[in-house]
Amino acid sequence: MKRRELIRTAFSTIVATAALSSVSARARSEDLHGLTLKKVPPDAIPKNDVPIFSPDDVFTMPEQFWRDFKGKLYIGKAGTDPTLPQNLIDVFVKNANGGTALLSQPIDLNSETLKTFVAAKGALWSASEYSMALHNDNDEQIFYVPDVKNNGVSEFSRRLSQPGGYQLIGEISSFASLRQTRPLFSGAKVRLKGWHDGTEVGGGAFVGEMTPSEDDGGYIASSGQDFHWRRVSDDMNRITLFDFGAVADGKKDCLPAVMAMYHWAQNNNQKLSIQFPAGRFFISSFDISAKYIRFLRLAGAPVNFGYFPATTLVSDGKSEFLFKVNARWVELSNISFEGQIEHSPNGQGFFHNICPAGQYFRGSCLRFTGVGGVSLSLIDTLDCKIDQWYASKCTGDVIRGSWSFTKKGNWDHNTAIELSNFNVQHCRQGKVLNLPRCTQSIIHNGWIEHSEFPGDLSNGQWIVDALSLEGCKNPLIAHCSRLNMRQTNLQSGSWIDNSLANDEWLSSFERGSTRVESYGIAVDGSMKYNYLTSRFRIENHSSQEKWYELGNIHTPDVGDSWEIEVFGQSQFSNGSGTKALMSVTDDRHTGGKAIINLQRKIHGFEASWSVEGSSPINDVVYTTSNDSDTRVFVKLAQWLGSAGVMIKTTAKDRFVTGHCARFDSRMVHSEPPKGEKVHSAVRRFSLHNGLAGIGANEQGDLLVESRHIDAAKVETSRAEGYISLVINGQQVAVPYFALKQNS
């Protein structure tokens, strides 16, 4: 059965029901409730006429219809206007006892005559094909059908009850048509096929009400008369721009739909969003910045991965920003914006919020491609988080933060910006992060690569966690900023400039930054700790000396110096006792350490060492297998309870250069190798100020150096006095002489 025939057949049941609601089975009355009935013999009904309505059909109509409806019904020749007298045809009423009457038209409709008709089991007879029109009591046409075919009613009812019967239900073709369609009764339901005629998006179920209401272009359909239709929705967040007439062809301007949905959300619940469905949408410019609002949500189709949002927006590049707002709280999510600068150079940005003195912004799953202006522009942020955002081939700033200088609240900076899970590639001219003066802010898991200007974080306070910069021509500017960085990845010459500059805004008493990496910690500031210890602990709980390999030193540059301190005391079980110390090498000390000094030469290394107190080691050996590497071995003293190893160097670390100095620890008991490239470090010590001092050499000599005095100036006739010394364990007296008075 063709769709048009199905609709006509369905209307025949509705119209017939409406007609007989006015007919009494007591056809003996010539006038009943305003109806005119003329008695006729049963054979007055033409042979080709058929029953077009019976009491059973009444129960197919909604109770709301026949309970409240009042109006007039016209039945005429098929294909004509039945409201014209010349087109009317005969309509007969036949009751269960065979009584027949001719019904005058138009037929007045009311609920009382319907009840009597049902009680009398009456039937309505007329031609099998006819036209009909139904008007309300204000003579307003509810519907008009030019060709009703009654003989399909039973077949239609049977097919409608089948599993696929839903396919037979009619739909209103467009939102414009819905506005003009009058509900049969309050609470009547219809289905809209599509917002635009010929489409199947933006449709849905609507409920009719017999009261006036203002049309909003998507949720309420109204022609301004005394009725309206309301969209059926169990979740307002599921309403999208399709429901307000947007077209996802990337060409038709969706601004009217965006404005309509925005006003609908503001009038119903400001926390509702302008919800884009999946697709490609063109928008010229959405500018509502002239009026302050509290809430604005702008969202695309839900996604979990911001790399490829299902909603793409494009524009013509003519406006400064695609979206310009003045809102305190903003949510922006699940949108890809293509600026199309590769096809048409322009300076259009994506989003700008001008609300001063505190903005709350939440962005997620955003992608910016080929944007000529600022992608995200914010001012006076108070709480801002942007997660899963991506940009490529942009020429404007990707994220920019500025301030309004509002006096109340001292708004000369931004606060609490968090940027997480982002990737930016191949951007030029503009800055990726143009965010100076941002305090209490965070960067987490971001990657900026092959971009001309990574950004400006100057005069800010940032926690930077897992930021990667690769192949960027210019540094990430962070002049005078307080940075706490961890796991920073700088590749292909990229770097962060955290130096001081002339425009310092933060307090000079709070200067400093830290950087924590797997290869080291860099602190630009003071360190305050409870105690200091080494990660290497050495022990020798035996009466025998033992060789121990500390590790390998790699230092690329000639002249680099290393100092290894082995801190610990041998002979831990015996204290210094109560006797005076008589031997610097053999007597017991409380405490001890050995200092090993190494320097990279043109070819290999040189080393010397000295001790203080009860030395934890008795010898040092090093190798020179190649110019830049040396292995260091120490002979542990017997009964070494514990010792720690501390290392210092002048060599370049990983914070300075990629090919940096390195200490590869071994920390195992191991005999040193043999051969000509194995050397014993000499035992040398000196303490001086460049003019005078003391020392000791590897031959066991004490070295003393002081200013020379001419003998003629010394009174040598007698000693002025004596001082006590212990030489090689023996206490002796050493005389000293005074200078002559005239000298």
Curated annotation (Swiss-Prot):
GO cellular component, one term: periplasmic space
Compartment annotation: Periplasm
Main location (coarse class): periplasm
Protein name: Amylovoran biosynthesis protein AmsF
GO process terms (BP): polysaccharide biosynthetic process
Alphabetized UniProt keyword annotations: Exopolysaccharide synthesis, Periplasm, Signal, Virulence
Superkingdom, natural source: Bacteria
SUPFAM superfamilies the UniProt entry points to: Head-binding domain of phage P22 tailspike protein, Pectin lyase-like
Pathway: Glycan metabolism; exopolysaccharide biosynthesis
Family: To R.meliloti ExoP.
Role: Involved in the biosynthesis of amylovoran which functions as a virulence factor. May be involved in the polymerization or late modification of the repeating units.
Cleaved signal peptide residues: 1-27
